[in-house]
Amino acid sequence: ADIGAGTGYYSFKLSDKLPQGKVYAVEIQDEMIAVLKKRKAALRNRNVEIIKGSAMSPNLPGYSADIVIMVDVYHELEYPHEMLQSIKKVLKKDGKLLLIEYRGEDPAVRIKPLHKTTVAQLNKELSANGFTLYYKGGFLPIQHFLLYEKK
């Protein structure tokens, strides 16, 4: 599930790699949902399902996702606690949550501070909501790549 799918860049990339699977493209903005629908039709895609989410929930069935990704989305959440609790219900038993966020610790990352997040802050918030850090990738030049699992 790609929460905050936007134009579907990651949703459709994942779809190509998982032709027998299902990819949920979750978006709250109607304009982006329209873009997703047009793109899905243009690509004749059959395994991306477009979902209208809300500020508090991705509106997905329980235990329906092996992985949830949020790319440059977490810092934008209006209700992070509620969203994380909803994501916990969506993830399958061994499911994972992937967050990619701009590095708040690095002043060289030329992004407005309100669009950056530190690992310490993410770990604190995720831990308080029943997640633990599973893997931290250091291969992206200006972003964190953090994979969490349910406690």
Which residues are covered by each model-predicted region?
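Conserved class I S-adenosyl-L-methionine
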Residues: L98-N123
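Helix-to-beta-strand junctions that scaffold the AdoMet/dcAdoMet cofactor pocket
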Residues: L18-P19, L77-E78, L91-K93
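Core SAM-dependent methyltransferase catalytic element
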Residues: N129, Y134-K151
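Class I SAM-dependent methyltransferase SAM/SAH-binding core
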Residues: A1-P58
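A short beta-strand submotif of the Rossmann-like class I SAM-dependent methyltransferase core
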Residues: I67-V71, M83
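Glycine-rich phosphate-binding loops of nucleotide-dependent enzymes
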Residues: G4, A65, Y135
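A short glycine-rich, Lys/Arg-flanked "PGG" loop and its adjoining helix->strand segment in the class I
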Residues: H81-K96
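A short acidic, Gly/Pro-enriched loop at the edge of an enzyme's catalytic core
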Residues: P58-V68
